[in-house]
Design a protein with these regions (language model features):
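A domain-level signal for the structural core that forms small-molecule/cofactor-binding pockets
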Residues: 2-58
């Protein structure tokens, strides 16, 4: 049962997240050979000021 976590900035609509979750689910089913109802997608929305790359703010 894949649990897929997506970290992103806040601001996407519920419709955008739903469409993205469906696309992720479709890929997981095709690639991982799992059932649709076994795929869980979790969105974690963190403000941009919490994101760093190589120790530097994005």
């Amino acid at each position: 049962m894949p649990l897929i976590t997506v970290s992103m900035y806040p601001g996407r609509t519920e419709k955008q997240k739903e469409e993205y979750a469906k696309a992720i689910k479709k890929s997981a089913v095709e690639i991982l050979k799992t059932k649709e109802n076994h795929v869980i997608v979790v969105f974690e929305e963190n403000p941009k000021e919490n994101w760093y790359m190589a120790g530097n703010p994005l």
